[in-house]
């Protein structure tokens, strides 16, 4: 139901931001970060392990789709293979050319890091979403998320979606999680906004929130279009 006395039928035009977003302005200085936010133990181990393999790829190599290392050297019967979900069949099939091309490197690397890659199913999966391998490329040049689907690596100049609690983005260059305060800045909350002392609650709230400036832009443009303000 539309009130014709308010809506005149014209499209709402939202303003477009033309400037360049400097990601660094959202971050605290590395020396000011609480040590608890720096990755360690299994998380650091598995990322450093994968980084050793990434550095063996040729410049220009395209890594797609998800590399599933714990399936790379297994031999499945036709019956076993056909029992897998379609997505898994596709990944295994599409992984084969890359695994074959770098087979000696993969074999040595996999055997050296077997314990961590098999410790959790997701540790054996790499989702490389940064395009072709570049000169001096590294997992730690980018953003990283430990997801249920695997270790996702995304370009360092786009911030990953904030997902409540379980998939806190890792800022690769500093090997640390993004802090709740930095998440709040990314969502355009003012510095005076009070965050919960419980990080889990803060990450959840910020992951479920919408950028403040975006909300303001939509509401103000809508009200102006309807000549309410």
Describe each region flagged by the PLM.
Residues 1-54:
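Flexible, glycine-/basic-rich loop-and-beta segments that form/coincide
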Residues 35-229:
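C-terminal target-recognition/interaction regions appended to catalytic cores
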């Amino acid at each position: 139901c539309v009130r014709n006395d308010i809506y005149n039928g014209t499209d709402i035009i939202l303003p477009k931001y033309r400037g360049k977003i400097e990601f660094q302005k959202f971050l605290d200085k590395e020396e000011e970060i609480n040590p608890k936010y720096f990755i360690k133990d299994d998380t650091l181990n598995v990322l450093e392990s994968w980084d050793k393999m990434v550095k063996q790829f040729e410049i220009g190599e395209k890594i797609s789709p998800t590399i599933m290392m714990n399936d790379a050297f297994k031999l499945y019967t036709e019956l076993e293979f056909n029992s897998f979900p379609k997505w898994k069949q596709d990944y295994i099939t599409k992984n084969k050319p890359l695994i074959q091309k770098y087979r000696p490197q993969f074999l040595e690397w996999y055997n050296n890091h077997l314990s961590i890659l098999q410790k959790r199913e997701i540790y054996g999966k790499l989702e490389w979403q940064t395009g072709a391998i570049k000169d001096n490329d590294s997992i730690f040049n980018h953003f990283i998320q430990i997801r249920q689907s695997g270790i996702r690596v995304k370009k360092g100049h786009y911030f990953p979606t904030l997902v409540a609690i379980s998939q806190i983005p890792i800022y690769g260059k500093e090997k640390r999680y993004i802090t709740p305060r930095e998440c709040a800045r990314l969502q355009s909350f003012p510095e005076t906004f009070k965050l919960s002392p419980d990080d889990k609650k803060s990450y959840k709230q910020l992951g479920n929130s919408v950028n403040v400036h975006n909300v303001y832009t939509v509401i103000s443009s809508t009200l102006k279009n309807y000549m309410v303000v």
